[in-house]
């Protein structure tokens, strides 16, 4: 049984980790950390866990964490980088859901996140945790940087085309929409009900922190520089993400066949039939990504949907854990989408 600890257990991604791990046959949560709620019963904060979790919150410095086989960090950026070293030294595996280890160049990271990266040595050893791209590296990793939600949706849309060297890598447009849970569980005027209800708005246009992260991976896949225009939008729903990615084809190829062949062995990526377009509700509460494709002459639109706090965060983190421990990557992640 894999002994699990979660640091930052009261955020949305921390709660989602608890929900999913509760049904994992090979994992047991032994430590849930929260400085604000230390000593408080988990079920007092989250009544939905009554009957499932019988733990109290502990401080992130509690010795119980050193009994874990793996620790998930579901913390704001800047926390994990200064905390994970002590656990790695003891042979404990780390999966970081923050952005601390996603960007390989520390100066680039500091530019986008506004603070100095203090652990550039660890950046070199961190593996980017997108199983559909780096599964073999994840299997041998001790420190995994769990991807952001937007990069996950964008990269899965573009990977088959980049591998086939079939698109213009400088004219890509990524138009993305995310549910409000992507902003986290904190006090923020911009995400209050009255601010987001019955409204749709773009934000951080082409300046979102997820852009350099996605660019880094796309460039690695293509083996050439990749650039794209990125417009994220906030939509008035809790969970879900839709990425509509527009590209110019440089080859006359059967894109439907390309995508189906490329993802045929990937458990959680499903290419829809011609003329069928993905919808967020189909993947709500799951680790799945649905992909729809529309071609018009040399123009192609790839549409991907994911649950932003499942495949876009916690579900993907558990998929990574499964790979790191050499077990079936789908364990604990076989949920059907929540309908209606």
From Swiss-Prot:
A Gene Ontology molecular function term of the record: NADP+ binding
Q: Could you say which EC number(s) this protein's record lists? A: 1.2.1.38
What broad class of enzyme is this? oxidoreductase
Q: Which reaction equations make up its catalytic activity? A: N-acetyl-L-glutamate 5-semialdehyde + phosphate + NADP(+) = N-acetyl-L-glutamyl 5-phosphate + NADPH + H(+)
Q: Please state where this protein is localized.
A: Cytoplasm
Q: Which InterPro entries match?
A: AGPR_AS, AGPR_type-1, NAD(P)-bd_dom_sf, NAGSA_dehydrogenase, Semialdehyde_DH_NAD-bd
The biological processes this protein is annotated with in GO are:
L-arginine biosynthetic process
Identify one Pfam family in the record: Semialdhyde_dhC_1
Highest taxon of source:
Bacteria
Active site annotation, chain numbering: 149
Gene Ontology cellular component annotations, sorted alphabetically: cytoplasm
Pathway where this protein functions: Amino-acid biosynthesis; L-arginine biosynthesis; N(2)-acetyl-L-ornithine from L-glutamate: step 3/4
Which Gene3D superfamilies does this one have?
Dihydrodipicolinate Reductase, domain 2, NAD(P)-binding Rossmann-like Domain
Record keywords, A-Z: Amino-acid biosynthesis, Arginine biosynthesis, Cytoplasm, NADP, Oxidoreductase
Write down the SMART domains for this protein, in alphabetical order: Semialdhyde_dh
Q: Which family does the UniProt entry place this protein in?
A: Belongs to the NAGSA dehydrogenase family. Type 1 subfamily.
**Role:** Catalyzes the NADPH-dependent reduction of N-acetyl-5-glutamyl phosphate to yield N-acetyl-L-glutamate 5-semialdehyde.
Report the PANTHER family cross-referenced here. N-ACETYL-GAMMA-GLUTAMYL-PHOSPHATE REDUCTASE, CHLOROPLASTIC-RELATED (PTHR32338:SF10), N-ACETYL-GAMMA-GLUTAMYL-PHOSPHATE REDUCTASE, CHLOROPLASTIC-RELATED-RELATED (PTHR32338)
Question: How is this protein named in the record?
Answer: N-acetyl-gamma-glutamyl-phosphate reductase
The organism named in the record is Ruthia magnifica subsp. Calyptogena magnifica
